[in-house]
Amino acid sequence: MLETRCKYYKNEAMFHGFIPHIMGTRFDILLIHSDIDRLNTLWADIAYELERLDKILNRFDPHSEVSKMNNHASQSKIQISKELKSILQLCSYYYQTTSHLFDITLKDFSRIQLHEHSYISFTSPDISLDFGGFAKGYALKKIRKFIEQENISDAFANFGNSSILGIGHHPYGDCWKVSFLNPYNQSLLKEFDLQDTALSTSGNTLQYTGHIMNPLTGIFNEQRKASSILSPDPLEAEVLSTVWMIANEQEQKKISEKFNNIQATLYNL
């Protein structure tokens, strides 16, 4: 059962929901509204949705849908859920629009074969799917819809300080302020003022280096660099923050022309 916690701060009309372990990280959300019952219901819906998505996309869970697909799709056609089919179609779109730098197979997305009636197969036995650079952005997009449906105008959702959505503003400010720190020395790289905007960051750290691979070359990026993407779309921000770590200047320019609402920055650490 998913572990969740929550607390309501009456003076600020602020609800804090917390999940210590989901999608490989922690999740926090702040919801600003005076109706505590409404916020409790919304929080329950969000927590349920995150658990549901994790059961689809978490490749480390042997019972998840993606794990079952990874184990069998290279052997024969298997049927997948309509949502996973839709997700794969989204991934195909980002594969094409990022010059093949976004690739959930880390090898060759074209080896995924989608068939009629939501069946899928892999044309190579060594293909498996990893939604690590997709799932949190996809989840934030879903969460935003829940918040909008409840007509809540101020909220802040945060996956592990790397995938963030700011809606409206903080109770004591005109935006949601987020500091992006250098992971090697904790100095300030940039401060963002989020207002109806998503932020995604990516990069190497002292403890976590060489985890980002260029699918076109098979080479892991071990440079002391980090990236940040601002976008109205949380999923675009998530996808492109990883892409920016491996794209060269020419590729970045080409991709920027297709995503003209983003603000992308690459940092030397």
Model-inferred region functions:
Residues 1-269:
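Mature catalytic core of soluble alpha/beta enzymes
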